[in-house]
């Protein structure tokens, strides 16, 4: 579960609160948190986490020397248990001090391995869609190892589904949530953002104060993966809605630009917290 630098500890605490995982099942690393969790936990984290950028399932870790080793490693992953050849996919690759001369070529070799594996196992190859793929595969290469992941989130998790109106430099929802976590605010005392812009911080705070899960208004990548069971997912949604409650603290926001206050009010309405936040225009 990748996150912004410095947020790892807060994310680990959040994942523990969501799943109950502890000890060796929940480890903090540089730029993210790793968990040994169930498929149900993966869906629950997607639904409830405010801090992670996405939830990735690690499928393999392999030593390599060249691009052909990448092909071999990717061809040994059972992609056919995750999606079908009728679906589209995309390879995203990142590197940390990799000796490879071209990451684009490395991604192409992994893509070929996935497609060839499907042709061998299912008789046809899935197509690539670099814009709106059904399935996102992530590859990370270090000087010696290749790690392959399948994405369960789809669009980045900062996209909550309620922000339609935004200013010129909107604050990502995950960063706003990290700022709230770092402040130590526990939803029992009032919160005031005097430069609220389009309302990101007050809206995140209001949802926290009301127990509203951040992912209730969006779709997720796991809904297109073969392990997905809709009745289990609907149960998690119902469970989340059952935990919503009246606000535990008042939330306030203001901005010198009345246009931004209007944006904030409309965003708050879509986020289900319009009656929880008091917005006003004026100089801080």
Question: Where does each model-flagged region fall?
Answer:
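Non-catalytic nucleic-acid substrate-recognition regions in nucleic-acid-modifying enzymes
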Residues: 1-135
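Short loop/turn segments at secondary-structure transitions that flank enzyme active sites
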Residues: 41, 97, 145, 154, ...
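C-terminal edge-of-domain segments
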Residues: 137-153
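Conserved S-adenosyl-L-methionine
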Residues: 171-283
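Short glycine/proline-rich turn/loop motifs
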Residues: 94-96, 158-162, 242-245
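Beta-rich nucleic-acid/ligand-interaction surfaces
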Residues: 132-139, 198-199
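SAM-dependent Rossmann-like transferase core, predominantly class I methyltransferases
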Residues: 148-184
């Amino acid at each position: 579960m990748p996150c912004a630098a410095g947020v790892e500890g807060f994310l680990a605490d959040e994942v523990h609160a969501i799943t109950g995982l502890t000890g060796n099942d929940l480890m903090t690393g540089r730029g993210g948190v790793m968990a040994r969790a169930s498929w149900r936990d993966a869906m629950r984290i997607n639904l409830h986490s405010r801090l992670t950028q996405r939830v990735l399932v690690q499928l393999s870790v392999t030593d390599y020397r060249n691009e052909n080793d990448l092909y071999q490693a990717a061809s040994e992953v059972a992609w056919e248990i995750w999606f079908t050849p009728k679906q589209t996919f995309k390879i995203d690759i990142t590197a940390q001090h990799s000796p490879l001369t071209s990451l684009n070529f490395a991604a192409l070799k992994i893509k070929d391995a996935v497609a060839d594996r499907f042709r061998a196992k299912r008789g046809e190859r899935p197509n690539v869609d670099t814009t709106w793929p059904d399935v996102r595969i992530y590859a990370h290469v270090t000087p010696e190892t290749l790690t392959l992941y399948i994405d369960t989130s789809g669009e980045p998790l900062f996209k909550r589904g309620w922000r339609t109106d935004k200013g010129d430099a909107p604050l990502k929802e995950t960063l706003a949530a990290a700022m709230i976590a770092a402040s130590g605010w526990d939803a029992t005392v009032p919160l005031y953002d005097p430069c609220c812009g389009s309302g990101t911080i007050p809206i995140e705070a209001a949802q926290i104060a009301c127990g509203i899960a951040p992912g209730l208004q969006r779709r997720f990548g796991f809904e297109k993966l073969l392990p997905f069971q809709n009745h289990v997912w609907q149960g998690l949604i119902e469970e989340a809605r059952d935990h919503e409650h009246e606000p535990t603290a008042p939330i306030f926001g203001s901005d010198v630009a009345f246009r931004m206050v209007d944006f904030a009010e409309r965003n708050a309405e879509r986020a289900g917290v319009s009656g929880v936040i008091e917005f006003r225009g004026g100089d801080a």
